[in-house]
Amino acid sequence: MNQLTGQLVQYGRHRQRRSYARISEVLELPNLIEIQTSSYQWFLDEGLREMFQDISPIEDFTGNLSLEFIDYSLGDPKYPVEESKERDVTYSAPLRVKVRLINKETGEVKDQDVFMGDFPIMTDTGTFIINGAERVIVSQLVRSPSVYFSGKVDKNGKKGFTATVIPNRGAWLEYETDAKDVVYVRIDRTRKLPVTVLLRALGFGSDQEILDLIGENEYLRNTLDKDNTENSDKALLEIYERLRPGEPPTVENAKSLLDSRFFDPKRYDLANVGRYKINKKLHIKNRLFNQRLAETLVDPETGEILAEKGQILDRRTLDKVLPYLENGIGFRKLYPNGGVVEDEVMLQSIKIYAPTDAEGEQTINVIGNAYIEEAIKNITPADIISSISYFFNLLHGVGDTDDIDHLGNRRLRSVGELLQNQFRIGLSRMERVVRERMSIQDTNTITPQQLINIRPVIASIKEFFGSSQLSQFMDQTNPLAELTHKRRLSALGPGGLTRERAGMEVRDVHYSHYGRMCPIETPEGPNIGLINSLSSFAKVNRFGFIETPYRRVDPETGKVTPRIDYLTADEEDNYVVAQANAKLSDDGSFLDDSIVARFRGENTVVARNRVDYMDVSPKQVVSAATACIPFLENDDSNRALMGANMQRQAVPLMQPEAPIVGTGMEYVSGKDSGAAVICKHPGIVERVEAKNVWVRRYEEIDGQKVKGNLDKYSLLKFVRSNQGTCYNQRPIVSVGDEVVKGEILADGPSMELGELALGRNVMVGFMTWDGYNYEDAIIMSERLVKDDVYTSIHIEEYESEARDTKLGPEEITRDIPNVGEDALRNLDDRGIIRIGAEVNDGDLLVGKVTPKGVTELTAEERLLHAIFGEKAREVRDTSLRVPHGGGGIIHDVKVFNREDGDELPPGVNQLVRVYIVQKRKISEGDKMAGRHGNKGVISKILPEEDMPYLPDGTPIDIMLNPLGVPSRMNIGQVLELHMGMAARYLGIHIASPVFDGAREEDVWETLEEAGMSRDAKTVLYDGRTGEPFDNRVSVGIMYMIKLAHMVDDKLHARSTGPYSLVTQQPLGGKAQFGGQRFGEMEVWALEAYGAAYTLQEILTVKSDDVVGRVKTYEAIVKGDNVPEPGVPESFKVLIKELQSLGMDVKILSGDEEEIEMRDLEDEEDAKQADGLALSGDEAPEETASPDVERDAVTKE
């Protein structure tokens, strides 16, 4: 054994685990939700300021008035977080901006503080509360603005290239070659033009100027031959015709159009990242590397020769020349005339021999953009010329094409930037309004407040939080789901990809994902590979690129230093990186001579002196959820993906239990998820209650501990999460404990002693039992039901609102028509259910009546009206009732009244919210899973006495099918099973970190230590007969979780219910209380059996024969024979469809008589005409009125 394995490691205050790690951790895991919090913090500190600087000053059309934004401040939130949730409001703070209005004529300056709306504030846990619902803004992966070159092969097999200049916002520039070796340019996706047209338009009018600039070559000659414009003016007109077809072109218009398209910073923005990427790509050194010079390089200051003509620039020479390159070698000033560009253009150009030329005589120009400052955010003529030069260089074999799936070319837009973009849209709309108002209103009396209209700003922010694809309702099933959701990276969304267009390449795992994006955790289904998760150690840099930490190797000594560098994907491409498991001596030098390392996605073996960096940790590859799977290295990746995804669906149990076999990641995940209560300052616990913990702060003054303030931490008690699971916190510290900053004071849901605890440790045997675990089904002992091992608490929220209707206000009352006293027994005098009452399906929760329409009065009613003066108030019962499957215990009732000053939506006078809590024991049909993607449905719950038992008489808890293991190749579950059994006997907990956990030998040694046999199998006895089974069976402790797919939520039955308006067929789905569709294939089955009457009944009275279904219902109620079915409504719809196409459709009987179609009303009229009027209690059934889908039988 390695000296590290078998050490006890402390996780938090309460838990020790025996760790099987061989590699010591050199870097603490970062705060896992930092990606959210730091991005939002940047937005508040810098992002907003940038926006206000970009937009100010706003000047009117004459340039007389100017409005500047000077400073801004955020006030305090109106309500605290919990109260915002309760009141259904947004957790936000008022944004006030200091604005200055300057009148240049009079020199008058007015300063004013302007309120710019309430701005949503991020909570400490990285979420937003919007209208009372907790939401998360997911980070978006997009292509970075830059210039991209890529190869293409046309249909004749000829190789060519395409290039694209992609800005953050603005017009795209695309270059491409065709079959005849002509180079074309497209401006903003219009038709293509020869690239020389663009050069002429910039101000290089003659052929000779262009040849001098780019360098003589055959591709340029072909392009010039194709180009039929001779000078700048014609080129400008040509471009104008392409961009604005149909408008009369003039040279001046064309100049201003091109100028505004590309060189106006307001219209064209590369952002910081775009300028950085373009400077990097167009830097001349990348194209000079390993090329043969066609001119001598001389230091312009001293005249010293740096490199001879004909010399090859290898890495050494290039490193020597580099400082001089940036200092002015090859710099050229160009003076374009007659085109868009008025000023001189600075370029850097060096001649080299073309590597593709056989004789080696052809020279080509390599042009760089001469290091433009980062402050210039728009594209410059130098950028355009050097990108064209790069394109011609590529045709001669100089330069590299780009891989757009490389993470060096994809960046993250996190919360801050997404908000900033949205805010920019609002501000630019506001700017337009300000300009208009400046020109309309009187300049002397005007104030900043009158100019500024904050509506567009508020609207754009509201729209973003409310309806953007990236603003998502937080997945709050358990703390891990919360954590993962905040670390999610999506390639979808505005400005991103769409599911349909995304091909295989985008979705695939790329070598640059290493340590940045998890290769395992991604959804199954249409979004696979488009939604990813951030790796555990990854950070995001200021440009939005994902960085991962590496340990620096000192190039002089070859030792691994304690210094840690964060590298982006394209920086990493320049280095050789060793794996985290490379063997090191105590002083940090490599023990082996040859070392397995990575270089640009290739795994190679290199000499130890060639290593530049070393991985920080084996788990830096995977995400937080994947790092919670022990023995991950023994699982197939497809199953690991399911394991990582299913942990997020674990339902918090009543008595959670941390895994006996963990990975050591449980503590960090639990702490950072935001579900636990974290101590903010060091101190001593003074008082602990179920709902609150009080901590007395300690201040260090001159080395003495001095008592400070008393902090009160409130705990959540039985709160409904977004997904209807129960969020409940319990204190785990006791009075007198000294606590430090960052310590866990109270466990959240699915946590035990500060560790994530999604399920329970149960005794599992791999064996079949009378075929009940066919197809991954699970057989379970009744003990798990009886002892509430897998019992979870679910809270559902129901609301009823009393509105103003056209006929009068609705009223919440106990006085409901046609409801007996028995049904009202649990309602209080207001008509609202009492807390603690037990309710079943269909019980009243809130009594509510709605005024009915005024109907024509009968003679009797008119008489009563004449005598008593008041018509008996006509009301309908619209009470809130418990839906199917929603019964439980009333946990809480909240009442909001407009009179009491509560903010309610317009038209609502009173709102009642009722929370029903259910205790759900595990039952047949529930879905369960392990952590290795081994999922199944419970098929049978056996009495404890029938379960197989161990030699000491202990019955096992769960039986799994052994056939579920070999084909799925998730062997990790078997190792977990054995390790768990050994740990149970030894009374310890175990940490087996991913990719660095217990090996087979460790498992066997631990088994022997626990006194078990090496194969960990045992004799089992049949609980029914007491006979031993023929073979020994693998039995052990496995961590099993109960998933959110519970049979109680899926069970559904209907006899009558709502029908669709057009076809009159029952609706579908449990949510609509729909029926089971009897489709085309099912009809074939009945036809095959010749079950004619069953089939007729299904297609008519049980579906859309409107008349027939009412009559059938009546007949069943009265006990009569069921009448003949009529014509299905969908047949009538078909006839109408044909009639709408202009066909005259008649239905004829067998003897050519026309059959008349009759509606329900016609039937009733006919009956009444025949003197068969219905008695009062069987009034004619109303068909569904066009505005409401209703139950045709119970009329609800």
Swiss-Prot record:
One of its GO terms (biological process) is DNA-templated transcription. Pfam families: RNA_pol_Rpb2_1, RNA_pol_Rpb2_2, RNA_pol_Rpb2_3, RNA_pol_Rpb2_45, RNA_pol_Rpb2_6, RNA_pol_Rpb2_7. Residues 1152-1196 are annotated as: Disordered. Keywords: DNA-directed RNA polymerase, Nucleotidyltransferase, Transcription, Transferase. Its EC number is 2.7.7.6. SUPFAM superfamilies: beta and beta-prime subunits of DNA dependent RNA-polymerase. Residues 1152-1165 have a biased composition (Acidic residues). One of its GO terms (cellular component) is DNA-directed RNA polymerase complex. InterPro entries: DNA-dir_RNA_pol_bsu_ext_1_sf, DNA-dir_RNA_pol_bsu_external_1, DNA-dir_RNA_pol_su2, DNA-dir_RNAP_su2_dom, DNA-dir_RNAP_su2_hyb_sf, RNA_pol_bsu_bac, RNA_pol_bsu_CS, RNA_pol_bsu_protrusion. GO terms for molecular function: DNA binding; DNA-directed RNA polymerase activity; ribonucleoside binding. It catalyses: RNA(n) + a ribonucleoside 5'-triphosphate = RNA(n+1) + diphosphate. CDD domains: RNA_pol_B_RPB2. Residues 1187-1196 have a biased composition (Basic and acidic residues). It is an enzyme of class 2 (transferase). It comes from the Bacteria. DNA-dependent RNA polymerase catalyzes the transcription of DNA into RNA using the four ribonucleoside triphosphates as substrates. The RNAP catalytic core consists of 2 alpha, 1 beta, 1 beta' and 1 omega subunit. When a sigma factor is associated with the core the holoenzyme is formed, which can initiate transcription. Belongs to the RNA polymerase beta chain family. This is DNA-directed RNA polymerase subunit beta. It comes from Bacillus velezensis (strain DSM 23117 / BGSC 10A6 / LMG 26770 / FZB42) (Bacillus amyloliquefaciens subsp. plantarum).
